[in-house]
């Protein structure tokens, strides 16, 4: 792309992905797996819909005084919270529940991952996460997800049937030798 090198925050994508996954889990009354893990498409979706921030704005492990994130305690708090919301009787009349659970979920995410900035200054210029992503020239739509599975036709798109592909994104299926060649 020729626009320089960047160090973007993985945790910005993680924060937004966890919130989306929690909402999908609540909406489906727990029929989507809410757990650690994700897919390639989560990153592309996150960039397209939420943007990018420099790593310095939301570094990994910052809430623990570490250089890497540790999700074990986070999961022991977050997973039962989301499960409890999915079992709430309010959801029988409203697929998204009340707005209050989202505030509580954001509080958990902020406590364990950090708060996502709405604006930030990078090299003297103010950005939003969306304007930051746009300034890089990176277009998530220019990328495809590749896979190699024998139970689907080759050279066609299909949905990878794994619990971490909760967004039901598609992958282009290649024979294994061609898949390895393009890797």
Name each model-derived stretch.
Residues 1-183:
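Catalytic-core signature of thiol
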């Amino acid at each position: 792309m020729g626009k320089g090198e960047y160090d973007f925050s993985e945790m910005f994508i993680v924060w937004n992905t966890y919130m989306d996954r929690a909402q999908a889990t609540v909406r489906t009354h727990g029929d989507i797996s809410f757990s650690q893990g994700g897919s390639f498409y989560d990153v592309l979706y996150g960039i397209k819909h939420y943007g990018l921030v420099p790593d310095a704005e939301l570094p990994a492990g910052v809430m623990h005084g570490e250089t890497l994130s540790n999700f074990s305690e986070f999961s022991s708090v977050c997973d039962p919270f989301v499960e409890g919301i999915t079992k709430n009787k309010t959801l029988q009349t409203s697929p998204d529940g009340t707005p209050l659970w989202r505030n509580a979920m954001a509080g958990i995410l902020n406590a364990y991952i950090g708060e996502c900035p709405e604006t930030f200054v990078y090299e003297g210029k103010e950005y939003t996460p969306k304007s930051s992503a746009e300034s890089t020239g990176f277009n998530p739509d220019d990328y495809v997800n590749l896979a190699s599975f024998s139970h689907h036709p080759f050279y066609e798109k299909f949905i990878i049937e794994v619990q971490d592909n909760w967004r039901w994104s598609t992958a282009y299926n290649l024979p294994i030798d061609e898949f390895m060649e393009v890797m």
